[in-house]
Amino acid sequence: MAITLVNPSGLPEIDVYRQVSIATGSKLVFIAGQVAWDAEGITVGEGDLAAQVEQCYLNIGTALAEVGGSFDDVAKLTVYVVDWTPDKMPLLLEGMSRAAAKLGITPVPPATLLGVAALDVPDHLVEIEATAVLD
């Protein structure tokens, strides 16, 4: 594993991610923003933020597996949520938890959450980018 995740003392400990990732590998993997499309390009969970978050994470898992990686190799996530408000956090966490259970992982690398006005198509409520480092 080329990534070590750390919560430094002096920074708040966040349940859903770590504050710092230390990358020691040499192969960088940049995964395009994943939306809630299945393998056929059909939107999963129309109108359901939790279902869409879950599908985004599953898509990232598929992309990582294709290049010989896993969520253990993820150094950074960027999450874009349409019309973000803090009351959407439980849905975001529910989707993450469901994906983690299916993938057998805990996706806790450093993450940035950004509220956006819109994504590529109106049905998409969330998009997630990942950067990974492989040995």
Question: What residue ranges belong to the model's regions?
Answer:
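N-terminal presequence-like segments and the immediate start of the first folded domain
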Residues: M1-L58, T62-A75, V82-D135
